[in-house]
């Protein structure tokens, strides 16, 4: 009996001691799980821990600093490159317009060539504009109170001509408010809706639903297109990624719309993912935490 009690007491002590000893490791693991490209400087590990874990914490924090510097340099390069490209692209567009005005009568081959030049120059201009926006995201204040419902209706009005070309029905349900950048959230929902229209079937539907659930504001954009293959569902948020390159060119995309959407969601502390996708359509789900939204 005494032996059993000693064993039991030893087991209890070992449990509490091991729990205390492993607490810094659990804290370390929890912080690692929180790391995102937009919060590198906010997820550092406190270095005032047990000596055994102090070096782990220091190395981890140094790694975050290097990553943050790398991302900052990448954003700086992207912004500089976009700035440098804007002027020559503007000159090219002006020269094309001037040539067309001075030479209204040209051969069919020349007309086709000029049309191709205009399309590609406009595409490059849009790409440059988006890259510039992505490089400047962190300078945009996210402190405005935004009503999602009216914003969705405004987006539907702006995209109505595009939807009418394929006889796409635009539908919205629910509403909600949140704190953020009105300009960026408009761009987020505009990009998702435009994508859902462009890659939809003729006579299809685009449905945006807004709701509060599990302490989050949820926004879903559902289309009736042909779906996204399983291997590509995470890759679609990468810059310049295309599931079907030829189809993307036909639809006029530059491959940055969903990447910009991901950046905007991350800036607001949210998450974006492909919730469902099949041959019957795709649902893109966006969620914002309660500290960025309110009932």
Predicted feature locations:
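Short helix-loop "hinge" at the ATP-lid/N-box region of the Bergerat-fold HATPase_c
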Residues: 196-197
């Amino acid at each position: 009996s005494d032996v059993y009690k000693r064993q039991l007491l030893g087991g209890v002590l070992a449990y509490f001691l091991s729990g205390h000893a492993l607490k810094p490791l659990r804290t370390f693991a929890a912080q690692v799980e929180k790391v995102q490209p937009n919060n590198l400087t906010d997820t550092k590990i406190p270095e005032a821990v047990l000596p055994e874990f102090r070096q782990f914490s220091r190395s981890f924090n140094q790694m975050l600093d290097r990553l943050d510097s790398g991302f900052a340099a990448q954003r700086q390069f992207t912004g500089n490159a976009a700035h440098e490209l804007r002027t020559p692209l503007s000159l090219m567009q002006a020269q094309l317009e001037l040539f067309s005005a001075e030479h209204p009568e040209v051969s069919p081959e020349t007309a086709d060539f000029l049309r191709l030049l205009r399309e590609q120059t406009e595409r490059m201009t849009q790409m440059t504009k988006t890259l510039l926006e992505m490089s400047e995201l962190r300078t945009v204040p996210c402190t405005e109170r935004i009503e999602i419902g009216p914003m969705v209706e405004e987006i539907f009005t702006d995209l109505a001509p595009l939807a009418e070309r394929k006889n796409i029905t635009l539908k919205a349900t629910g509403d909600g408010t949140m704190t953020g950048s009105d300009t960026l959230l408009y761009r987020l929902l505009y990009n998702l809706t435009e994508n859902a229209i462009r890659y939809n079937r003729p006579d299809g539907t685009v449905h945006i639903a807004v709701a509060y659930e599990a302490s989050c504001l949820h926004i879903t954009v559902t289309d009736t297109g042909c779906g996204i293959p399983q291997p590509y569902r995470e890759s679609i948020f990468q810059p310049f990624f295309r599931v079907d390159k030829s189809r993307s060119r036909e639809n006029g995309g530059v491959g940055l719309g969903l990447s910009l959407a991901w950046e905007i969601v991350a800036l607001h502390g949210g998450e974006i993912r492909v919730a469902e996708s099949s041959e019957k359509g795709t649902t893109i789900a966006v969620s914002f935490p309660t500290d960025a939204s309110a009932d």
